[in-house]
Amino acid sequence: MKKLAKIFLMGMYLHLVLSIAVPMGMLYFGDSGWNTVVMGLFEFYLAMAVIVHIAGWVCVAAAGMAYCRNEADNLRKGWKWLKLWSIPFYILNFLYSCLVWFVLVGASRGMMILLVPLPVIFTCILIVQSGCVGICYIMLLRKKHQKCPSGVHYALQFFPVIDIFSTILILKKQGDE
């Protein structure tokens, strides 16, 4: 589970790097419009976005299997790794997205505002995926009756920033640092 969480997390960071590099490459190589290089970069970016989401759902499936097998330690390690090491990703993603979309919407005189929901939806799906891993761990704790976190923690796993506080509270309650 921890390996899959690391792969998913690396994919998230790779997507962030590509979110910066691909548009820059498209601007650099796109002097003559949508040529082969620009299309290739754009297609590569989209393919990597799909791969990151596939890795996320594979991680969720692995968490579900760990839950079914009662592998609390394995699930806790993957969940902890995924939640805590994704904090810088979400901060950088938010800052970059605000900057880029502010510039794009301003430069297009508002026309690009229609595309703003796309990266927001992409990020929300990542949050849902990591939240599903957290829910599997919480369900396992409740199943084993080990210092059960309250049911509110299920919902908190799906809210950015609050999910981190929920994660830390649960880990402290379990005696983890």
Give the location of each predicted region.
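Feature detects long, helix-prone N-terminal segments enriched in hydrophobes
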Residues: M1-E177
